[in-house]
Amino acid sequence: MAQFFKPKKKASVNTKHLSVDVVRLDHNGAGIAFVDKKPVFIEGALPGEKAIIQFIEQKKQFSRAKLIKLAQKSEKRQTPICQHYHECGGCNLQHLQHEEQIVAKNEKLQELMKKQGVSQGEMVQPIMGEELSYRRRARISLMINKQTNQLDFGFRKKQSKAIVNVRHCPVLVQELDQHLESLFTLLNQLKGKKNLGHVELVQADNGSVLLIRHVADFNEKDHQALVNYCEERNLILYLMPEADVLNHVRGEEPFYLIDGTKIYFTPKDFIQVNRKVNEQMVEQALSWLDLNENDSVLDLFCGLGNFSLPLAKKVKTVVGIEGVDDMVQRAKLNAERNHLSNVSFYQANLEEEASDQVWASTKFTKILLDPARAGAAGVMETVAKLKPQTVVYVSCNPATLARDSQLLIQHGFKLTRLGMLDMFPHTGHLESMALFER
């Protein structure tokens, strides 16, 4: 007998306005209220506020709602610094005083560790940099506006592919922010502007970098206009005609300094966006490892050598492991350029068990790891089996840090220090550092 497909009825959403009391923030910075014992997530609401909301999504376990207005405001609320704040998808906590953002993130970090049954040890003071003008990297979205035939130039709207036109961003370092207006004007004048994909701006220690992604070659006039613009402003220029092709057109090779070491990079490479916090982060990690000249250190998820190269100046040997081979090759070159012969780099998939790797049979006294948001579940068994004296875990996701901490504790480690890094002020992103000792 034939069976006919019957599409499920789309769940209806109660669109009536409702008054709720906001009790806390979630790990992304949204306010949480409870309706019939079910959590409701409200972007833009703060603890202690009475909010008038409208549901936009209702599920079995939770709901999401739009903030209509505030019947009662928190004393910790402030006027957002940016004129685009309520549209732009970048920052989401500018309505909360910065010092209160720190408090909320600290509480969230401790809450997640406690939830996983991890005893936190000493809670150290947060690492902080500038509240504004801290981002040394930005990706500018571009799109032809069909109504005006001009480029939309800026950042994506909240939960949308549409673009908020931006000519000034208060969290960008001033060296980059100053170019937004003139860059918009230049790109709009190009004959081939419809072939533009996106733009990236990166602030290196030896200049500002402009990367232009394009899907067709520029004509000679457009190409020269780009070169002239960069020469007038002393910008380092890269053109990217394909996803895996990067052409260095003018300027020096970009680098940044960390602990007196030059880290060369391309605008495709990952680097930490907050220079001041990165410098303090590396300094604290090296301090927590309590290094001596006889130590052998393993640096997992090492990237270009942000930790590995400063480590190599203080210990006997360093081994850096990274999943992206291009970055491994550049890390090796960075070691050579800094005349560091006691550090070696290997490519490995750290999402998988690594005990059969050559480097995993080495005796390491200390281990540092700095994984992406997914954490380091694949390599934690290897870390535990290596039995180092000390492990420093740098995390950009407290949930995966809490999860991975459990395995170390099961293998006899104790979490002795925990601290927050204010890498991304005015956002819900929470970075942290944990020290484990046996």
Curated annotation (Swiss-Prot):
It comes from the Bacteria. One of its GO terms (molecular function) is rRNA (uridine-C5-)-methyltransferase activity. It is an enzyme of class 2 (transferase). Residues 10-69 form the TRAM domain. CDD domains: AdoMet_MTases. Pfam families: TRAM, tRNA_U5-meth_tr. The active site is at residue 396. Coiled coil: none annotated. Its EC number is 2.1.1.190. Belongs to the class I-like SAM-binding methyltransferase superfamily. RNA M5U methyltransferase family. RlmD subfamily. This is 23S rRNA (uracil(1939)-C(5))-methyltransferase RlmD. It comes from Aliivibrio fischeri (strain MJ11) (Vibrio fischeri).
